[in-house]
């Protein structure tokens, strides 16, 4: 037996539970380490299987595919560790029973982000590679903040890679960087609540919780568990950043030392390091609270045992740029910009390059994305608005009357937070999907007209009839898409195609 075979035989058996993007990345990572693998999925032909089999041709892999609704009784035999896919709900069968067996057998359960954290720890020892790590979580805005933060960092002269929930998987990005001998100075990680549930040792240099509203309660069970999952990233972070407009986010940092906390919000910032918005002479500004001392402040003296904890001082407000100079639309995106700048500033980057990049940033697809204007009506694709909080933010942020297209799979959400914002900002609502009628029922007290549509074509045409010059037709469904579409990008693409078709029918091109 050669050396490689010996090391593989001695390595503990790892079970990859679920062959989504993170499961594939974890399998590839462990194969690089010479670990024997057992791979299972409820599907007989999960996506990417052929590519994975080709990549792991020389690895020791046992495939258990097509398990359906019940895992084989011997699935855990010989297993030392389980890598759990974030797509599997831990309190639902058959995953619940398997995880209970794992606990009884003292089998460790981890996620791909935990493996990434351990990989960085290993690289620190073997190659003295110690990158900065920034982490972003929250119900809405994660992808925008992650992508923008990476661009701000690169504008400031540091190399950065974005990974995690934004795709690619963190381990896939790390393997690519290793293979190209191009390890970045900074990792910018978008982390979902699912991923944080199985992450224990990641200690970011800075982490932000953007907001916490109802979502994924089918996965977490209740709002408290969902918020706790988000909060996991703040305590180990050297710098914790929260949205001070969000009571649940603010509560997460109450026990943390004030000097290690920063915030952003819709109001004027009062404490050094905080950021916010200011309305002056009819112009809204992105602002920062900076120290009154132009020299670098002296380090804080060692605190005596019974002394009160240190607090952050007030400072002077600096106007950075007008909100109207941003290409991304809405107050919620102005807040996303503040969060991204705070993360980048944690790396001691200057304002100038960041502000130039921020001015040119056009946003991410399907997130308050202007498709085009037809007859002085804006058509906006916010298909990524898959929960009530996202739709509330979009309605509040646009600053114009809206004909809202909403509906789909509601995921057991409470739709009542839509009532006050629809009453204030919506001229009409067009409802689609299996839970469209449920949304309409909740919105009855608003008095806002609601119309049902059988498909996206009818929804766009009906919304166009209801809109008036100066309005926006906003696709922000507050629901998942799987009842009518492959996913939320497909939903957004169909919306955009129908808008373009409407423009052609009305004789408007480009």
UniProtKB/Swiss-Prot annotation:
Pathway(s): Cell wall biogenesis; peptidoglycan biosynthesis
Family the UniProt entry places it in: Belongs to the MurCDEF family.
Subcellular localization(s) per the UniProt record: Cytoplasm
Top-rank taxon, per record: Bacteria
Enzyme nomenclature, EC number: 6.3.2.9
Primary role: Cell wall formation. Catalyzes the addition of glutamate to the nucleotide precursor UDP-N-acetylmuramoyl-L-alanine (UMA).
Catalytic activity: UDP-N-acetyl-alpha-D-muramoyl-L-alanine + D-glutamate + ATP = UDP-N-acetyl-alpha-D-muramoyl-L-alanyl-D-glutamate + ADP + phosphate + H(+)
Keyword tags: ATP-binding, Cell cycle, Cell division, Cell shape, Cell wall biogenesis/degradation, Cytoplasm, Ligase, Nucleotide-binding, Peptidoglycan synthesis
Matches recorded under InterPro entries: Folylpolyglutamate_synth_CS, Mur-like_cat_sf, Mur_ligase_C, Mur_ligase_C_dom_sf, Mur_ligase_cen, MurD
Enzyme category, top tier: ligase
Pfam families: Mur_ligase_C (PF02875), Mur_ligase_M (PF08245), MurD-like_N (PF21799)
GO cellular component, one term: cytoplasm
HAMAP family reported in the protein's UniProt record: MurD
Protein known as: UDP-N-acetylmuramoylalanine--D-glutamate ligase
UniProt gene name: murD
Protein residues bound to ATP: 138-144
Region listing for Disordered, in residue ranges: 294-316
GO biological-process terms attached to the record: cell division; cell wall organization; peptidoglycan biosynthetic process; regulation of cell shape
GO-annotated molecular function: ATP binding; tetrahydrofolylpolyglutamate synthase activity; UDP-N-acetylmuramoylalanine-D-glutamate ligase activity
Recorded coiled-coil stretches: none
């Amino acid at each position: 037996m050669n050396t490689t075979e010996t090391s593989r035989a001695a390595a503990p058996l790892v079970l990859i539970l679920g062959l989504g993007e993170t499961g594939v990345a974890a399998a590839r990572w462990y194969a690089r380490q010479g670990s024997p693998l057992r791979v299972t999925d409820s599907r007989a032909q999960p996506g990417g299987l052929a590519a994975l089999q080709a990549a792991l041709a020389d690895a020791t892999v046992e495939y258990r595919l097509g398990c359906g609704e019940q895992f084989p009784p011997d699935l855990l035999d010989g297993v030392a560790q389980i890598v759990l896919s974030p797509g599997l709900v831990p309190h639902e069968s058959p995953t619940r029973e398997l995880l209970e067996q794992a606990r009884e057998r003292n089998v460790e359960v981890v996620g791909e982000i935990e493996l990434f954290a351990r990989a960085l720890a290993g690289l620190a020892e073997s190659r003295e590679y110690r990158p900065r790590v920034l982490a972003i979580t929250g119900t809405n805005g994660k992808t925008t903040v992650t992508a923008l933060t990476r661009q701000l960092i690169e504008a400031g002269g540091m190399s950065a890679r974005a990974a995690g929930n934004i795709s690619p998987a963190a381990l896939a990005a790390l393997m690519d960087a290793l293979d190209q001998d191009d390890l970045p100075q900074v990792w910018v990680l978008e982390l979902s609540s699912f991923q944080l549930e199985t992450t224990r040792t990641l200690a970011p240099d800075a982490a932000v919780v953007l907001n916490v509203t109802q979502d994924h309660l089918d996965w977490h069970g209740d709002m408290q568990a969902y918020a706790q999952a988000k909060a996991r990233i703040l305590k180990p972070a050297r710098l914790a950043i929260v949205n001070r407009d969000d009571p649940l986010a603010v509560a997460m940092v109450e026990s943390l030392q004030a000097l290690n906390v920063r915030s952003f919000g819709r109001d004027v910032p009062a404490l050094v390091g905080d950021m916010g918005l200011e309305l002056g002479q009819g112009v809204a500004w992105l602002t920062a609270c900076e120290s009154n001392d132009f020299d670098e402040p002296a380090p804080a003296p060692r605190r005596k045992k019974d002394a009160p904890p240190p607090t952050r001082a007030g400072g002077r407000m600096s106007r950075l740029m007008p909100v109207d100079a941003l290409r991304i639309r809405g107050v919620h995106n102005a807040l996303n910009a503040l969060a991204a700048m705070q993360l980048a500033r944690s790396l001691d980057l200057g304002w100038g390059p960041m502000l130039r990049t921020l001015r040119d940033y056009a946003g991410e697809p399907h997130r308050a994305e202007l498709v085009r204007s037809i007859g002085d009506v804006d058509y906006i694709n916010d298909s990524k608005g898959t929960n009530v909080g996202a739709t509330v933010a979009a309605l509040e942020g646009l600053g114009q009357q809206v004909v809202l297209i909403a509906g789909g799979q509601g995921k057991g959400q409470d739709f009542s937070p839509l009532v006050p914002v629809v009453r204030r900002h919506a001229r009409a609502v067009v409802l689609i999907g299996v839970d469209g009628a449920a949304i309409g029922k909740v919105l009855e007290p608003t008095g806002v007209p609601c119309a049902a549509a059988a498909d996206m074509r009818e929804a766009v045409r009906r919304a166009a009839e209801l809109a008036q010059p100066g309005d926006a037709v906003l696709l922000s469904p507050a629901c998942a898409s799987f009842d009518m579409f492959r996913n939320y990008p497909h939903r957004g693409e169909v919306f955009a195609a129908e808008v373009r078709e409407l423009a052609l029918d009305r004789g408007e091109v480009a």
